[in-house]
């Protein structure tokens, strides 16, 4: 089975409908006193400190927290909501996953890809230094526990790398966490690969623990990674089988990617049935998590 790349899109309707679930399942940081987002359903306006282009349509943005000692208030594998009000008075709400360390103080980082029809992503890309954006959260996604799984597989595409990178970063940061990680990450071109320097540095420092494969749909002549889409055969040959002990697979990407790899989520509270490549390989609902 071949897996297509496509833009990740989230609608304000979905974000709003999920709000009651999200905020009844909060991931509060260990130090609640310094947390900026406290899980109380209150929007907090934060100022853009700086931004830089990562590619022709992707930016890294640093937002200031209220004080130099403030933390954002998220834990590993959690996210937040962003909001802005249009000139006509409509609320636009979208979820994003920060890529900075949850324990970072004074600021945090988002990586945002702009899509032609993406109201929030276009708005964020137009922000200037000193402009503010409203945030709320945190949103729990998955409660990571070190060493719960001997080995995990992360399968992502496009900006779907952000929650997967959170897991990679947390495992790398914790010397007691010996979880082995396989990352299969697909994009259209080399310029679309996000966080590559950070991921490569981790894999180079701990090659026995972090196994990374990049896939390009449109590789250049000198590309040394994998060509084409993430195939069922590649997953089978480069990660633990479904009958392995305590196996876990994490998936994040656009809707066509979910459909091909794992099957779609039904709602924020319902992971849906496992379908696609992972179903064909024998994985069940307990073994697969869809961000």
From Swiss-Prot:
Entry's localization field: Mitochondrion outer membrane
BP GO annotations: cellular response to oxidative stress; ergosterol biosynthetic process
EC number: 1.6.2.2
Membrane topology: Single-pass membrane protein
Protein name: NADH-cytochrome b5 reductase 2
Organism in which the protein naturally occurs: Yarrowia lipolytica (strain CLIB 122 / E 150) (Yeast)
PANTHER family from the UniProt entry: NADH-CYTOCHROME B5 REDUCTASE, NADH-CYTOCHROME B5 REDUCTASE 2
Stretches assigned to the FAD-binding FR-type domain: 41-145
Family: Belongs to the flavoprotein pyridine nucleotide cytochrome reductase family.
Superkingdom of source: Eukaryota
Keywords: FAD, Flavoprotein, Membrane, Mitochondrion, Mitochondrion outer membrane, NAD, Oxidoreductase, Transmembrane, Transmembrane helix
GO cellular component, one term: mitochondrial outer membrane
Transmembrane intervals: 7-23
Binding sites annotated in the UniProt record for FAD: 148-183
Protein purpose: May mediate the reduction of outer membrane cytochrome b5.
Cofactor names: FAD
Primary subcellular site in the record, as a coarse category: mitochondrion
GO molecular function: cytochrome-b5 reductase activity, acting on NAD(P)H; NADH dehydrogenase activity
Reaction(s) catalysed (UniProt annotation): 2 Fe(III)-[cytochrome b5] + NADH = 2 Fe(II)-[cytochrome b5] + NAD(+) + H(+)
Enzyme class: oxidoreductase
